Curated annotation (Swiss-Prot):
The lineage of its organism: Bacteria, Pseudomonadati, Pseudomonadota, Gammaproteobacteria, Moraxellales. Its cofactor is Fe(2+). This is Probable cyclic nucleotide phosphodiesterase Psyc_2036. AMP binds at residues 25, 70, 100-101, 220. Its EC number is 3.1.4.-. Belongs to the cyclic nucleotide phosphodiesterase class-III family. InterPro entries: Calcineurin-like_PHP_ApaH (IPR004843), CNP_phosphodiesterase-III (IPR050884), Metallo-depent_PP-like (IPR029052).
Amino acid sequence: MPSYPVSTVNTPDGQVNVLQITDLHLSSHVPASDDETSSEVAVCQYSFEAIIKQALSKEIRCDLIVVTGDLVNKVEPAIYDHIFTVLQDTGIPFACIAGNHDVTDETGEDLPFYQRTLITRAADPRLLSRHLIESEHWQLLLLDSSITGKVEGEITATDIDWVREQLASCTKPALIALHHHVLPVDSEWIDSHMAKNAEEFWQHILPFENLRVIINGHTHQEQTRHHQGVTVYSTPSTCYQFKPFEDNFAYDKKVRPGYRWLQLANNGKVASWVERLDT
């Protein structure tokens, strides 16, 4: 079994194949096979486990799994225990960071969002912050963009200083992973809950030419954007999806749960694509 958290990834050919999953939103630690209900709770549980099984059945070698936040829909240690057991059982190195739901519970989930009460929760200690993973040719920088008791995110001054130090001290191509998006996705409602100091973040990191890629969750949709030489990937949820380019909250019921592959090549180039759950 790989130790947690992973700090180095070594592969036979130097290339690192990363499986990104995000926004699991689990509300139960009961395995999907033991839950005979058709509730949203059971659906999220099933799709998480089914996506892991489907992704790892592909011909592509998986070298690292990165989980970019919102592992749970309510903060309970037993749910994290279950998630970490599923990931450990793959035998593949993995790393998890927090999203807003990992540090915030909601009351009145049946109410419109603005009528709900947000409750501050402490992050599970297994969720990583300012964590470096290195391979022969790449460096992956994992950030915790969550704010306890809030939906929106923030990259703190300490986080920014740490990223700048890593990018300055190591010339390897770099990937940053965090939960909240740092470029708008043209949906007013979710863009009001992005990383609130994204512009400041960009000002500090753009001078570093070795920064190639940023990956995030939070948006529950697939998007690819480019900003001054940096490619930014938003990745679908392993559960339910949000309708893209909608200013008001809306589910996208036409697309299935998904996950993202990233191939980090030895020459600093990146290939990435999204796959959807088959059944």
